[in-house]
């Protein structure tokens, strides 16, 4: 660790991912996405092991896609959904991640425990429209460890927003995934230049050095 004008700068991985000031984010790991990623079985196994090793050492926050009511959403959101589902009539948009639907559920093998936080959010950033930042500041969290789906969307946008707010963004390379393997790989390569991208085994080894 270095220090400048009273600011503590963590410059080694064990310091950065110290459990005392870190939080694990499990981003949008819901059946409606998990069932379409390119490496479903490997991803779920990697994530299960990682969560099991982390639990009890640092807080864990699960996010859930929570679409706004059709009557309270934006024109852009509706247009984007039309493109996503390839429909030319807004009235033909299917229900997506509706409350109580199987697609909204978190897979059994990685379900949250009682002490984990489940955060409903309306956008592709963990900070937008939520009280997540307030909770992290209150808990004096400096490092956010990102896992989940999709790499090039919510993971990358949340990591960028985290960095812009002064948090250390850490991405667990083998615990993030996407429906688009090429987009996933491009995003990982981009984030490795901007943030901290490490394999789960490396992170666990350094977390355990505390």
Where is each model-derived feature located?
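Aromatic- and acidic-residue-enriched segments that line the glycan-binding/catalytic groove
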Residues: 71-85
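Short acidic, Gly/Ser-rich segments with clustered Asp/Glu that frequently serve as metal-coordination loops
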Residues: 30-35
């Amino acid at each position: 660790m270095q220090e400048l004008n009273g600011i503590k700068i963590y410059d080694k991985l064990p310091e950065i991912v110290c459990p005392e000031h870190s939080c694990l984010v499990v981003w949008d790991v819901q059946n409606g996405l998990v069932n379409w990623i390119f490496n479903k079985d490997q991803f779920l196994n990697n994530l299960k092991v990682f969560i099991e090793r982390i639990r009890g050492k640092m807080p864990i926050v699960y996010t859930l896609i929570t679409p706004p009511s059709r009557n309270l959403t934006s024109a852009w959101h509706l247009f984007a959904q039309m493109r996503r589902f390839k429909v030319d009539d807004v009235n033909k948009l299917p229900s997506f991640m509706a409350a109580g639907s199987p697609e909204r559920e978190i897979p059994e093998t990685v379900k949250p425990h009682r002490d984990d936080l489940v955060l409903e959010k309306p956008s592709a950033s963990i900070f937008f429209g939520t009280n997540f930042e307030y909770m992290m500041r209150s808990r004096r969290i400096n490092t956010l460890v990102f896992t989940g789906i999709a790499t090039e969307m919510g993971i990358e946008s949340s990591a960028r927003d985290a960095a812009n707010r002064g948090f250390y963004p850490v991405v667990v390379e083998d615990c993030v995934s996407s429906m688009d393997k090429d987009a996933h790989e491009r995003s990982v390569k981009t984030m490795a230049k901007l943030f901290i991208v490490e394999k789960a085994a490396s992170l666990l080894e350094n977390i355990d050095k505390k």
